[in-house]
Amino acid sequence: MLERLRGGLVASCQPVDNGPMDRPDIVAAMAQATVAGGATGLRIEGVANLRATRPLVDVPIIGIVKRDLGDSPVRITGTVADARALIEAGADIVAYDATSCPRTDGREDILAAILDGGAIAMADCATEADAREALSAGAAVIGTTLSGYTAETATDDDGPDFALLRRFRSLGGFVMAEGRFNTPDLAAEAMRAGADAVTVGSALTRLEIMTDWFAEAVRSAR
């Protein structure tokens, strides 16, 4: 499964929450369009979106559930129940928050549920320590997804964390570059820095965000 992703682009099809494109049928269409454009894998949020997409594509799907847990900053597949539901819906790979942030269901329990369900586990990490712990516990994929999004790693830099990506390369495991790789040049640089694959989201599937980038550039040029 991971060999099918190696050297390729993963399209994260996650429309803006509650926006006009936030519907399972539209997410599935986005997924088909990105595969037609050359994506070798998909990252799909939500069980309903995953169920709508799975029958329409034959590329590997990374499934996640995003939800606010209230008593925890963890938002990505933060419960055992969510991990199991994603596997039942057809996820080949389940990504989960592998940081040390407090949560009700321990990250070890979530990882165990993914592996027990027969899926591949992807650890969404913020630090090298997160990745090391995830790999030792059985995760096959380590992603730079959460660098810059935790209290420990918060930064004003709006670019990707290439330093972390390079450190991941030395750890073993399948390295997924993810998080602010929003131009073709940055995606290519990620591969040169040692990524096995690159995930791109907002620049491909969040039209409101992309439109705002262009609109702001035009306004500021007046």
Model-derived segments and their meaning:
Residues 30, 49, 53, 79-86, ...:
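A general structural detector for well-ordered alpha-helical segments in enzyme core domains, enriched
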Residues 1-84, 88, 129-136, 181, ...:
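Conserved N-terminal beta1-alpha1 strand-loop-helix module at the mouth
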Residues 39-46, 74-76, 83, 92-104, ...:
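Catalytic beta/alpha-barrel core
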Residues 22-26, 74-81, 106, 156-163, ...:
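Alpha-helix N-cap and loop-to-helix initiation/capping positions
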Residues 16-21, 161-222:
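Alpha/beta catalytic cores of nucleotide-metabolism and tRNA/nucleoside-modifying enzymes
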Residues 14-16, 65-69, 89-103, 141-154, ...:
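Glycine-rich phosphate-binding active-site loops on the catalytic face of alpha/beta enzymes
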Residues 38, 57-61, 89-93, 115-119, ...:
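Glycine-enriched alpha-helix->loop->beta-strand junction motifs that scaffold or abut catalytic
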Residues 82, 107-116, 126-146, 154-173:
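Short loop-to-alpha-helix "cap/lid" segments that border enzyme active sites
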